[in-house]
């Protein structure tokens, strides 16, 4: 498989830039992307099997990988959920698929959000990982407007090897993540 544009950009220009910025003594100290996880909670999936199937197809179309169905660990009467019922779907992307998805997310999908001024720089977890929520699946060019039965969002988590938020923010900014100015 050929190297993606973003991965070659990372290896050729971003790594030397981060080594100079943070005074790393070893190339392996430079933060890198580990994985990207996409999660979608489906409250109505317990009653409606078609919505589960539609979500699986949409996420598979967007990521290029079939998602795993997450199931309820225990019964909750208030939500009308029994143990083992499907409550969401999740997919973990690594290596080439991760770089390809991240590149499409940053260059194609995020700019298609209405009134987009950048993503919040406050969504880091303290260890250099970043999470963002997407309100509708229509921002992805792979999803056709006519095939959508209901607008659903998803959570996208970007896991890095960065030791703190500052390193993680520098890595994602170099990779093209459009952070909002504070």
Swiss-Prot record:
InterPro entries, alphabetized: Ribosomal_uL5, Ribosomal_uL5_bac-type, Ribosomal_uL5_C, Ribosomal_uL5_CS, Ribosomal_uL5_dom_sf, Ribosomal_uL5_N
GO process annotations (BP): translation
GO molecular function: rRNA binding; structural constituent of ribosome; tRNA binding
A Pfam cross-reference name: Ribosomal_L5
GO CC term, one of those recorded: ribosome
UniProt keyword Ribosomal protein, yes or no: yes
Domain of life where this protein originates: Bacteria
Alphabetical UniProt keywords: Ribonucleoprotein, Ribosomal protein, RNA-binding, rRNA-binding, tRNA-binding
Family listed: Belongs to the universal ribosomal protein uL5 family.
Role: This is one of the proteins that bind and probably mediate the attachment of the 5S RNA into the large ribosomal subunit, where it forms part of the central protuberance. In the 70S ribosome it contacts protein S13 of the 30S subunit (bridge B1b), connecting the 2 subunits; this bridge is implicated in subunit movement. Contacts the P site tRNA; the 5S rRNA and some of its associated proteins might help stabilize positioning of ribosome-bound tRNAs.
HAMAP family: Ribosomal_uL5_B (MF_01333_B)
Identification of the protein by name: Large ribosomal subunit protein uL5
Naturally occurring in which organism (per UniProt): Nostoc punctiforme (strain ATCC 29133 / PCC 73102)
Lineage: Bacteria, Bacillati, Cyanobacteriota, Cyanophyceae, Nostocales
């Amino acid at each position: 498989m050929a190297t993606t544009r973003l991965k070659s950009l990372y290896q050729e220009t971003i790594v030397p830039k981060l080594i100079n910025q943070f005074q790393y003594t070893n190339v392996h100290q430079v933060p890198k992307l580990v994985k990207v996880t996409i999660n979608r909670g489906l409250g109505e999936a317990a009653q409606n099997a078609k919505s589960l199937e539609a979500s699986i197809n949409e996420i598979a179309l967007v990521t290029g990988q079939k998602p795993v169905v997450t199931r309820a660990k225990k019964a909750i009467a208030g939500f009308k959920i029994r143990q083992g019922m499907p409550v969401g779907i999740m997919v973990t992307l690594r290596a080439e698929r991760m770089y390809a998805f991240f590149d499409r997310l940053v260059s194609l999908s995020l700019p298609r959000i209405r009134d987009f001024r950048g993503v919040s720089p406050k969504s880091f977890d303290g260890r250099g990982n970043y999470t963002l929520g997407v309100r509708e699946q229509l921002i992805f060019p792979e999803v056709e407007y006519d095939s959508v039965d209901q607008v659903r969002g998803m959570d996208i988590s970007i896991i890095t090897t960065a030791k703190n938020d500052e390193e993680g923010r520098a890595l994602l900014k170099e990779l093209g993540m459009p952070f909002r100015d504070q």
